[in-house]
Regions:
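Non-Sec secretion/translocation targeting segments of pathogen effectors
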Residues: 199-213
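Extracellular LysM carbohydrate-binding repeats and other cell-envelope/extracellular binding modules
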Residues: 161-162
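Short conserved catalytic/interaction loops centered on acidic-Pro-aromatic/His motifs
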Residues: 149-158
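A structural signal for well-ordered alpha-helical segments within the folded catalytic domains
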Residues: 134-145
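Sec-exported extracytoplasmic/periplasmic mature domains
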Residues: 117, 144-149
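Non-catalytic ligand/cofactor/substrate-binding and regulatory segments of enzyme domains
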Residues: 1-134, 165-199
């Protein structure tokens, strides 16, 4: 029987660039959920394919639980939104006991309200000519470091922002996954059980994030 796993994948863009994201898989290899950083319209709270106006578009973390049982376990509604496509480059970043893998995944979910509360501008067309680029690939790195898994690169694809994070290093260290006792790992994470979700500043998208994480 296979272990649960956390997989890194790359959605190829225009043949040369890529949007990296995370997939949670069960022991049969089924995709239970996806984690993304996406450009999001500040006024409507909806994600968009690419940010084109830094004044209007912000970087947000999004969680899409696909499996009904998993969604129910975390108090969310199943969401069919998916960036999975056949033939995408993929790397398994972690595999193992179900409770350990879920604990890693949920460490990222717990940090989402803080990530989104920063209301970071999404750079026009995904990159900045001057200054650090903080974009969807930066969210990918941040979420991976929060889960305590290796953050792979994908050769032969441009990934602007992959070397940057959404939070300072010391804050990531404070929030990241740490080894837990078996009893703690087996506790089911729900947003209501985590005070940080309720203390985060409210934004147009915050209700969606709480309902999906």
């Amino acid at each position: 029987m296979r272990d649960h796993s956390i997989e890194a994948r790359l959605l190829c863009i225009a043949g040369i660039a890529g949007h990296a994201y995370w997939v949670l898989r069960d022991e049969r290899g089924n995709a239970l959920a996806e984690l993304h950083g996406l450009a999001t319209d500040r006024h409507t709270g909806t994600p968009i394919p690419i940010g084109t106006d830094a004044r209007r578009h912000a970087l947000r973390a999004w969680h899409y639980p696909h499996d009904a049982d998993y969604a129910n376990a975390i108090g969310a509604q199943p969401d069919r939104t998916s960036y999975l496509r056949d033939g995408q480059p993929a790397r398994t970043a972690a595999s193992g006991d179900k409770h350990e893998i879920l604990a890693r995944w949920h460490a990222a979910l717990r940090a989402m309200p803080e990530l989104n509360a920063q209301d970071l501008d999404y750079p026009n067309y995904g990159f900045k000519l001057f200054g650090a680029t903080i974009n969807s690939n930066s969210a990918f790195r941040t979420l991976g470091e929060l889960m305590g898994v290796p953050v792979p690169g994908f050769p032969r694809r441009l990934q602007p922002g992959i070397g940057n994070c959404m939070l300072p290093r010391e804050r990531i260290e404070a929030l990241r996954y740490r080894e837990q006792s078996v009893q703690d790992r087996q506790r089911v994470y729900t947003p209501a059980s985590d005070a940080s979700c309720q203390e985060a500043p409210k934004h147009a998208i915050s209700q969606h994030i709480r309902s999906n994480s």
